[in-house]
Structure formats: structure tokens, C-alpha cells
């Protein structure tokens, strides 16, 4: 049994095995706890209920509950001890055990960081007298199989009946296309179809719905995921964005006595989640990251799907008339999720923000969808601009996946007209001749006007280029001295990427480069790095002075970590000073579909490498500018306690160049010619 109170700490790398006194007392001698139950009446069906489904009236008093957690340990447990931390939170939650059964199914990890759970078996744990106790165990099964989940649900319903049931999925999440729950022992996960199959074979359905179903996992707050559970649950709680490694705050269990229905439970979960992270970010500013969590009413999902279908059926009808250009621009501008914690693009955007952007072209249909979403989203909170509580898959970065996505969504009977639309939209994006308007882009002449440190950059687009323009950014490169390079060609380091580019009605691109870059400084001798760091401004539907830069973390003596860990380190510029935030461990090749929800704690590493990738500049077969990565990275090593970052002016005489980078409405990228700064 895990004993003792556990309070979450800011450090993501805490050694859980050393943080608590853990004992194994064996199986429970208690019989299954059966709280008193009460009958619940149903409301009469309405015309909106196409399946003649009835909705239960709200409870007038607090019901008895059985809360079920399906905890797939994965590397989150074997590497970080994250499941153990949450089990300890459950023990310390103070939940009223007389009214609430809490049962946990564990497995799917190669190693567990406590003595209660063993990797060779799967366990069902029951919370008794503030301790988790084994009530059932068997030889380890694959938690990525639907049957394993179904068996757990059957066991709980049969042995721990209650007025209401809540089900929480704990582990990795990767959105509707990839699914949930990586069992690292079997290399398997649960797809949306498998989750649907598991619930279909379980005791929970139209006659006995779960009061609430939630995902303590990344990226599962999509309309497609919610659709899977519409027949099996009343309310749904999940995050649109990547969840931090600490996940939910299970102290919310103590508040269940004050909740009569699932919407109230969902609100408590969201509030505890945000209270915890607000406190964490105050104590540890470097831990700050984007967080979202929402509770939605699955009963209102049918109206959302209907409005979604009407909007995108009309858009689909217009794609052949050139509407693809404007729709593509709206898609690009939509708030996106899961952009920086994995090399995978999930193509998930905020549905409310997307609908808002489409209002100019389709005012009636977009407004109807927004109205439906208002009824659907019961409660949501975030520290993210344009996050409205529900995301949707919309192809853009990876249009080739749309065909497979369509098969998945069609099998789930989700929004067939929308599925037809995303197929047609993707086909338009992949048209082979779509980038022809920019074949002469490298001949466009860039202009520079320097005032002090600042450089005003501009470039005129042709009428044809303007027609298919979607977005623009600019890069700043530094030419390497010949004696510094590894090749015979000129090499350039990418030191800055800016997203704040404007386009006039006449087709003129303009941007202002402040003429400053971030340099690393050695604290012990005051020496600055020879080159600036590579800074990439973040754009995910919002534009702030927030950047990331690639780095490597070295652990010189800890065998539990790789010798070399690649990461993206986030940074904010405030009052002219760089402020380091969190760093994301870039997902490994074997688990690349799943974002790594655990942030890198830089304090765990003794040596940092800040590198700049080197490129050569040439032309492609059409005469357009082409950048080629040389395979080399130039940079500098700094000890953990012997560096700082400073924003400093660059010397234009050292050979700095600008280039505009255009993305057209079909997803093609085009580079302008290089033009020298300071001349």
C-alpha cells in the first residue's frame, strides 16, 4: 500500500521511489463496498432526440459513486514515476469512502516505482481507509486491447454498484488519429475504434450511462473523441492541449460530496486542475506552459455535429470555385494544439476559433455552429488565447493523412459530410501545380531600410502570387567566415525566425527586425558566444513575443538518462530580457505519435549545448532559392551554473542576411532571394 500524503512539487524529475515510504500488505480482506443506491427518473424524450433517447433528470441529492481509473503506466511510470505520484494523491485526497468507491486498474509499464504494483501482473486496487489495496490481480494483460478495458468495467459494475459511475483514462494521449494509452510492454494502444468497442461490450450504454468520462492525457479534447462516448456517458472532460506531466490534481475527489451530477464533477476537476498549475507556475516560473481543460455535455453533441455538417457541406460545395484559398488561410490562422512537444503534427485546431474565422464567408452557418458550441461546452478554462474548449482534426500540415483519417471517422459514423469535405480539401492541397505562382519568387527584390539597430524589410508580391498567398515569415541568417566552415560552399547560420509579417492590400510584405539577437554569456569570465542562438518565434494561431531554441542537454553521470537529450527550450522576451521557460524533450522515434508530457528539468543536467544549424544556399530545377542543411551544427557548451542569456544588438558588418518565406494556400513553402542587412 502507498502511504503518506503526497503534495505535487514543481520538479518533473522527482525520484518518487525515494519520496515516500511504500509498503505491500497483500490483498484486501474486505468485501466489495456497495453504497446505498437510489432510483433515477428520466425526462421525456424531445424532438431533438433522433434515437428516442431519454435524458435522466438531474439528481436532487448527492448520489453514491464508483470512480474507475484505467491507468496504463507506460514510460510515464517506468521513467518518471508519474502513476505512483497520482496513486499517492488519491490516497491523500480525503474522498468520502462511504459514498464513493475508487478503483484503479494498473498495468502497461515495464517497471513501477512502488512496491504495491508489479510489472508482471495487472491489478485492481480499491481505496480503503485512505490506502490503496489489491482486490484483484492476474498475469499481465495488454492494456492496449479493448477486452482488457471491458473486463475492468464489468468487474467494477458487478462488484461495486452505485447510483453513478465515473471513468478516467490515465496515460499518454495523441488525439483522434492516434488514440490513447501506450502499453510499453506490448507496444500497443487503444484507438478510438477500440475504445468504442470496449464501451459497447461493457455494462454502460443508453440504459446505464457513465455520469462522466475523462482523459487525464494529452490532446484528447476533440469533438471526434467525444463522439465515441456519446452513447456511453453524460459528460466528458479532456484537454485540447498537451497536459503537463503532473496531470490532474486528484484532490478533486474530496469535493465529490458536494456534486450532484456530472457537470458539477467536471467543473470541480477543471477548477482543481487550474488552481494547482497557477500555484505551480507562481512557485516555479520555468514550469509555465499552456494548459487547457474543459467539461462538455455529450447530450448536446448531436446539435454540434448537425451545425458542423451544414457549415462544411456548404464549404465543400464551393471548393471548386476557388474558396480553397480563403479556407486554407482560415485553417492556418486557427489556434493549433500539440505543436512543440513532438515532431508529429496532429492537425488539431480549436473548433470555436475556426468557426469564428469562417464567419465572414459563411455567417449564418458559422453562427449556428458557435451557438451549438455554447450549449456543448459546460465549463472550460485555459491560459491560452483562442482556446474554446473543443478541438477538431482539420488537415493542413499533413494532408496525406486525411485519407486514413477519413476511414477512421467513417467507421465511427462521425459527421460524414465533414469527412467528405476534409478529403476534398486535402486533395486540393496536394495538387501538383499549385505552387506555380511562386516559381519566380526568388527573383522578387527585397528592400532594407536601417534606422539604428532596426531594419525595415519589404518585398512586393506579384498579382499572381498574392492570389495564392497564405502566410509569411522571415529568417535572419549569419554568413560564416570561410575558415569556420566544413564545406567549400558558403554556409549560413539561421539565427532568427520572425512571424510578425504584414501584407498590404497592394501585396507588399513588410516586417521589422529589431536588430538584436540572444547571445549566451559565460558568467565566470563574461565572454559572449561567438554566434547568437537560433530563435524561432512561435505561431500557433496567436502571436506573442515567445520563442524556442534547439539545445542539447548532457547528463554526465546519471545512467537513468540518455547522454545526449535533444530538446526545444522555450523563452519569452520581457522588458528586453530573455526569460527561460520550460523545455520539451522531443519525442523518441519509437513513440513519436505521443507527445512527451513531461517537461525537461534543466537543473537535472550539468552541461548545455546551444547549436545553430548550418545551411548552403542554391537553386532548385525551377530556379527558385533552395536551402540545404549541411548536416553540421555550430554552437557552444555551457555549464549549468555558468551562463546567462542576453539580448544584444548584432553588428550588421559581420554579414547578416534576410529572406522572406512564403507559404501558399496549398501548403507549399517558397524562399525569396537573400538580401543583405545594413546596406
Say what each PLM segment does.
Residues 73-74, 108, 171-173, 396-398:
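Residue-level signal for short, function-critical loop segments
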Residues 106-205, 217-218, 223, 240-241:
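Catalytic-core segments of thiol-dependent peptidases
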Residues 23, 30-60, 175-176, 180-215, ...:
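Terminal, contiguous helix-loop blocks that mediate binding/assembly
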Residues 44-161:
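N-terminal extension/subdomain marker
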Residues 63-66, 97-102, 160-166, 206-212, ...:
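Loop/turn elements at helix/coil->beta-strand transitions in domains of secreted/extracellular proteins
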Residues 2-13:
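Hydrophobic single-pass membrane-insertion segments
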Residues 68, 168, 391-393:
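Residues in well-ordered beta-strands of folded domains
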Residues 16-27:
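Short extracytoplasmic/periplasmic juxtamembrane "stem" segments immediately C-terminal to an N-terminal membrane anchor
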Amino acid at each position: 500500500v502507498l502511504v503518506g500524503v503526497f503534495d505535487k512539487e514543481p520538479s518533473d524529475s522527482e525520484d518518487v521511489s525515494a519520496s515516500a515510504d511504500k509498503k505491500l500488505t497483500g490483498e484486501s480482506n474486505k468485501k466489495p463496498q456497495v453504497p446505498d443506491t437510489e432510483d433515477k427518473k428520466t425526462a421525456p424524450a424531445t424532438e431533438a432526440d433522433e434515437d428516442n433517447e431519454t435524458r435522466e433528470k438531474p439528481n436532487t441529492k448527492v448520489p453514491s459513486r464508483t470512480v474507475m481509473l484505467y491507468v496504463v503506466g507506460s514510460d510515464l511510470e517506468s521513467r518518471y514515476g508519474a502513476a505512483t505520484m497520482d496513486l499517492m494523491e488519491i490516497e491523500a485526497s480525503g474522498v468520502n469512502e462511504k459514498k464513493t468507491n475508487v478503483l484503479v486498474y494498473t498495468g502497461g509499464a515495464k517497471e513501477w516505482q512502488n512496491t504495491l504494483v508489479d510489472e508482471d501482473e495487472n491489478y485492481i486496487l480499491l481505496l480503503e481507509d485512505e490506502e490503496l489495496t489489491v482486490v484483484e490481480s492476474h498475469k499481465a494483460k495488454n492494456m492496449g486491447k479493448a477486452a482488457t478495458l471491458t473486463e475492468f468495467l464489468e468487474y467494477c459494475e458487478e462488484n461495486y454498484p452505485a447510483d453513478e459511475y465515473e471513468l478516467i483514462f490515465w496515460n499518454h494521449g495523441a488525439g483522434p488519429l492516434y488514440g490513447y494509452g501506450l502499453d510499453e510492454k506490448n507496444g500497443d494502444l487503444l484507438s478510438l475504434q477500440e475504445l468504442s468497442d470496449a464501451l459497447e461490450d461493457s455494462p454502460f450504454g443508453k440504459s446505464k450511462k457513465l455520469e462522466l468520462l475523462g482523459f487525464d492525457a494529452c490532446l484528447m479534447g476533440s469533438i471526434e473523441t467525444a463522439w465515441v462516448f456519446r452513447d456511453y456517458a453524460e459528460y466528458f472532460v479532456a484537454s485540447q492541449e498537451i497536459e503537463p506531466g503532473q496531470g490532474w490534481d486528484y484532490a478533486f475527489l474530496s469535493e465529490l460530496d458536494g456534486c450532484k451530477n456530472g457537470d458539477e464533477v467536471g467543473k470541480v476537476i477543471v477548477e482543481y486542475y487550474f488552481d494547482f498549475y497557477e500555484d505551480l507556475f507562481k512557485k516555479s516560473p520555468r514550469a509555465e506552459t499552456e494548459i487547457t481543460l474543459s467539461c462538455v455535455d455529450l447530450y448536446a453533441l448531436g446539435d454540434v455535429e448537425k451545425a458542423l455538417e451544414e457549415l462544411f457541406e456548404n464549404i465543400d460545395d464551393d471548393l471548386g470555385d476557388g474558396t480553397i484559398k480563403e479556407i486554407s488561410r482560415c485553417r492556418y490562422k486557427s489556434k493549433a494544439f500539440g505543436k512543440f512537444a513532438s515532431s508529429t503534427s496532429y492537425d488539431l485546431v480549436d473548433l470555436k476559433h475556426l468557426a469564428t474565422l469562417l464567419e465572414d464567408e459563411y455567417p449564418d452557418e458559422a453562427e449556428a455552429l458557435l451557438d451549438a458550441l455554447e450549449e456543448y461546452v459546460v465549463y472550460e478554462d485555459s491560459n491560452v488565447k483562442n482556446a474554446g474548449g473543443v478541438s477538431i482534426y482539420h488537415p493542413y500540415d499533413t494532408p496525406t493523412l486525411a485519407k486514413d483519417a477519413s476511414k477512421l471517422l467513417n467507421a465511427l459514423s462521425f459527421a460524414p459530410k465533414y469527412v467528405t469535405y476534409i478529403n476534398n480539401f486535402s486533395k486540393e492541397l496536394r495538387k501538383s501545380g499549385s505552387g506555380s505562382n511562386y516559381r519566380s519568387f526568388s527573383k522578387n527584390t527585397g528592400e532594407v531600410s536601417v534606422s539604428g539597430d532596426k531594419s525595415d524589410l519589404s518585398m512586393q508580391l506579384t498579382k499572381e502570387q498574392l492570389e495564392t498567398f497564405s502566410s509569411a515569415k522571415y529568417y535572419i541568417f549569419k554568413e560564416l567566415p570561410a575558415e569556420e566552415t566544413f564545406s567549400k560552399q558558403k554556409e549560413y547560420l539561421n539565427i532568427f525566425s520572425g512571424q510578425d509579417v504584414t501584407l498590404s492590400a497592394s501585396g507588399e510584405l513588410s516586417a521589422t527586425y529589431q536588430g538584436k539577437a540572444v547571445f549566451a554569456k559565460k558568467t565566470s569570465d563574461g565572454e559572449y558566444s561567438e554566434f547568437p542562438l537560433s530563435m524561432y518565434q512561435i505561431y500557433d494561431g496567436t502571436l506573442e513575443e515567445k520563442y524556442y531554441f534547439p539545445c542539447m542537454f548532457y547528463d554526465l553521470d546519471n545512467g537513468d538518462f540518455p547522454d545526449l537529450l535533444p530538446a526545444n527550450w522555450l523563452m519569452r522576451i520581457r522588458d528586453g530580457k530573455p526569460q527561460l521557460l520550460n523545455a520539451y524533450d522531443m519525442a523518441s522515434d519509437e513513440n513519436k505519435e505521443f507527445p512527451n508530457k513531461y517537461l525537461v528539468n534543466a537543473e537535472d543536467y550539468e552541461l548545455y549545448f546551444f547549436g545553430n544549424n548550418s545551411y548552403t544556399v542554391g537553386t532548385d530545377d525551377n530556379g527558385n532559392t533552395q536551402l540545404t542543411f549541411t548536416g553540421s551544427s555550430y554552437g557552444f557548451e555551457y555549464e549549468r551554473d555558468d551562463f546567462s542569456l542576453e539580448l544584444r544588438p548584432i553588428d550588421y558588418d559581420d554579414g547578416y542576411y534576410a529572406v522572406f518565406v512564403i507559404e501558399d494556400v496549398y501548403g507549399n513553402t517558397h524562399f525569396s532571394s537573400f538580401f543583405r542587412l545594413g546596406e
